[in-house]
């Protein structure tokens, strides 16, 4: 346990561009969800060398508190997403990492 008592055992933050139109749905229990793909590109320094970092990651937003923010998310929106990652099984049976958002900020 950290001295600060921060819960950081599974924290992930990434800035990127929304690359897929958000899909909105409601679960049978009435919880609203929004899902989209976020694309990230950057240059990172690793062992003194520049390395290009690139990813496309599914993002899932659940619950009424954050769903309101998703109304203005469109393809091309630049956002910062903070949350936790977990594995979802795709329809083809493959495991895929998904970022479950707990905080979203729009980047100008």
UniProtKB/Swiss-Prot annotation:
GO terms for molecular function: single-stranded DNA binding. The keyword rRNA-binding does not apply. Coiled coil: none annotated. InterPro entries: NA-bd_OB-fold, Primosome_PriB/ssb, Prisomal_replication_PriB. GO terms for cellular component: primosome complex. It comes from the Bacteria. Gene3D superfamilies: Nucleic acid-binding proteins (2.40.50.140). The keyword Transmembrane does not apply. Keywords: DNA replication, DNA-binding, Primosome. GO terms for biological process: DNA replication, synthesis of primer. Residues 8-108 form the SSB domain. Homodimer. Interacts with PriA and DnaT. Component of the replication restart primosome. Primosome assembly occurs via a 'hand-off' mechanism. PriA binds to replication forks, subsequently PriB then DnaT bind; DnaT then displaces ssDNA to generate the helicase loading substrate. Involved in the restart of stalled replication forks, which reloads the replicative helicase on sites other than the origin of replication; the PriA-PriB pathway is the major replication restart pathway. During primosome assembly it facilitates complex formation between PriA and DnaT on DNA; stabilizes PriA on DNA. Stimulates the DNA unwinding activity of PriA helicase. Belongs to the PriB family. This is Replication restart protein PriB. It comes from Haemophilus influenzae (strain PittEE).
